[in-house]
Regions:
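Aromatic side chains
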Residues: 10, 15, 34, 73-75, ...
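N-terminal strand-loop-strand
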Residues: 1-37
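Unchanged
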Residues: 41-130, 163-167
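Residue-level detector of alpha-helical recognition elements and their boundaries
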Residues: 27, 66, 70, 107, ...
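Class I (Rossmann-like) S-adenosyl-L-methionine-dependent methyltransferase catalytic domain
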Residues: 1-5, 15, 76-80, 145, ...
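Short, flexible helix/strand-to-coil boundary loops that buttress conserved ligand/catalytic motifs
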Residues: 38, 123, 136
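Generic N-terminal leader/processing signal
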Residues: 36, 56, 115, 154-156
Length: 167
């Protein structure tokens, strides 16, 4: 199996204070997994600007971005031909000040405001869940507890819920 070099992406972690501290997740287009808006670097734009553009296109939100990344996570994707591509995603916090009713990918995605605990339970990637947990704890002044069940248990439960069409 071939392993490709690591590709860079940028993401926004949209949040607001409404019914307490909330995180916005969206579904991916193909697998319908819960994720945060992310994409490729955009020529002529900073990393934070690229992340903000993805948040607008994928989630229909705008707001104030953190100047620096709040963290990063990695993931791998198997491409046709057997190559495994690796990605590093630098994540920027976005305090949401605008939520649009119409946005470019509205017909392709679902968006949902969630408590940090709900958000960390729904995302499949353990590194992203840990980043959300840490960021939410920093913003609320309270550390969120780590899940008490093993990651393998959560992965199996999520796969079962997807098979049953409940997620």
């Amino acid at each position: 199996m071939k392993v490709a070099e690591v590709s860079q992406q940028y993401a926004a972690l949209p949040w607001r204070r409404a019914q307490g501290f909330e995180i916005l997740l969206i579904t991916s287009r193909e697998t319908r997994r819960w994720v945060i808006p992310k994409g490729w670097p955009m020529p002529g734009h900073s990393a934070a600007e690229s992340a903000a553009q993805e948040a607008y296109e994928e989630a229909g939100v705008g707001g104030q971005m953190t100047a620096q990344a709040i963290g990063h996570y990695g993931y791998s994707k198997r491409l046709r031909g057997g190559t495994k591509k690796r990605f590093r995603v630098d994540v920027f916090g976005m305090e949401v000040t605008e939520v649009l009713d119409v946005w470019p990918e509205a017909h392709e995605r679902t968006r949902q405001w969630l408590s940090p605990r709900e958000a960390t339970a729904l995302v499949d990637d353990p590194e992203l869940a840990a980043l959300i947990r840490t960021f939410a704890g920093d913003q609320s002044g309270q550390a969120l507890p780590a899940p008490t069940c093993s990651q393998a248990f959560w992965q199996k439960l999520k796969a079962l819920l997807r098979l049953l069409g409940l997620r």
